[in-house]
Amino acid sequence: MDFHRVTATADPLYAPAMALYRASFPSHEQRQTASQEAILSHPDYHFLVLTEQGAPVGPLLNWDTPHFRYIEHFAISPALRGRSFGSRALQAWADRADTPVILEIDPLTTDIAVRRNRFYERL
């Protein structure tokens, strides 16, 4: 597995990663398209695309600062879910630096929030 940083919409991995992002998160949790495109060039914002054998398998959208890393969105292709790919990907990403990682989920009032919480607790 590799991590590819996207800094422009012209990157060939941007469109498939955005399609998975749009399919994986409710619209109220998504960044608007114009805002997403504008923030790509921010030095602390990392739009990472996880690839396996060159094929995109998920976005990991995060802020990487000198003091912490904050994950905004993380998704894995439905074909790879349930096979520990997401856990391995997050662990590999976390091992790349020694700053604390901040994860955020919504209150545990929806099925998706409960599932996300369980996933993060297993890490």
Locations of the language-model features?
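Short amphipathic alpha-helix that is part of the acyltransferase structural core
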Residues: 1-35
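Conserved active-site alpha-helix within GNAT-family acetyltransferase domains
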Residues: 107-123
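Conserved beta-strand in the GNAT
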Residues: 49, 54-64, 68-75
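Conserved acetyl-CoA-binding loop-helix of GNAT-fold acetyltransferases
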Residues: 76, 82-95
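Short strand-loop junctions, especially beta-strand C-caps/beta-turns
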Residues: 74, 79, 104-108
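Active-site rim helix/loop that mediates acceptor-substrate recognition in acyltransferases
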Residues: 22-56
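Conserved GNAT acetyl-CoA-binding A-motif
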Residues: 96-111
